[in-house]
Amino acid sequence: MKKVGILVGREKTFPEALIRNINERGRGEVTADYIKLGGIRHDAPPGYDLVIDRISHEVPFYRATLKRMALEGTIIINNPFWWSADDKFFNYSLAPKLGVAVPKTVLLPQKDYMSGISSESLRNLEFPLDWQGIVDYVGFPSFLKPFDGGGWKNVSKVNSLEELWKEYDQTGTLCMTLQEGIDFDQFVRCYCVGQEEVMIMAYDPRKAYLSGEQYIHNPDYLSPELADRVRKDVRTLCSALGYDLNTVEFAIKDGVPYAIDFMNPAPDAELASVGEFYHNWITSAVTNLVFKRLGEEREAPRYRWDALLNPEPTRTFAVASQVEQQSRTVVPGPVENSMAAAASAPISSEVSSVNSESSVEATKPSARKPRKNGKTSSPRSKTT
């Protein structure tokens, strides 16, 4: 018998439907339930063959536990190692290299820093920050949002430099991005399951988040040609990022889909939010993915970061303790040979040139000056 564990937060209808579907289809050979976790021993058996993670991004204890389970060969949807390493600004930088359009985006230094970080710790930061150059590049309206956030948390629309400063001053220690606002003709949110199955959903981001009014069931919302491009871009992004469950949002302007957000490894799937049609689709698609992954031949993972970051369905470990090697079967040849080849292969590097624009002295600097309490922040001085 194989066991599937569901790790959840506040959501109810999606995990309950998923557990019901898996148990009905599994007929006792595959069972699903909610995981219960307490103190975890470092050498504890995982207890589950596959885990669907919906909440570890908000609970570090869960994330650490999932990494431990992955080490023992448990399939985790989504991969906790990559999820921990990923961020949205990296994704925005990656997408154009994959042929996917994105809005102009700038990563900003933090407004504040934790206690103990002084101006001496920040000597690599430019001072003053060229705010005018940044907004000239991005334009208005634009969106100030965390470089690794989700769920529309701490996202602000700004229409002027003054509004930007006001919102930026409230961001504290969050690292933020400023992103071009696309005056879209159409907007879609797309489920992607198993890096293959795609459901395009008409979506209105102007409606209240989780209100049940954002998702619109309209199969003919996009032209066939545009729908094909969107599906292609979704699969390209999710395959490159390694996410088996994700959503990708596109703001479409003049026939061009701009990828706005594509780091959503625990996407909303609640019945009241997405509606019955999309709820049933995502539940069915994830159920199919579970049985597909459980049916794939898998070996114990190699105990190396790169192998855990990008596991393959069939993986034979090549780096393990002598005791474990005596108790498990090691298949010599291809794995060891490929590792040796990889170790001796030259590392290619791509050097990209950066076009420097003439700097316009900022009206509001972002370098940090020490406060009396030991914290640092952006001063509000102005230059003339």
What are these regions (language model features)?
Residues 48-51, 190-192, 256-271:
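A short beta-strand motif that forms the metal-chelation/ATP-contact edge
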Residues 207-215, 269-276:
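A short, polar/charged loop-to-alpha-helix boundary motif
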Residues 167, 177-179, 187-204, 258-263:
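Beta-strand scaffold of nucleotide-dependent catalytic cores
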Residues 336-384:
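Intrinsically disordered, polybasic Lys/Arg-rich low-complexity tracts
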Residues 9-121:
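Conserved N-proximal alpha/beta basic substrate-recognition cap immediately N-terminal to
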Residues 11-12, 57-58, 83, 149-150, ...:
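Short, solvent-exposed loop/turn segments at secondary-structure junctions
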Residues 2-8, 70-73, 81-188, 216-220, ...:
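Active-site nucleotide/adenylate-binding loops and adjacent lid/helix of ATP-dependent enzymes
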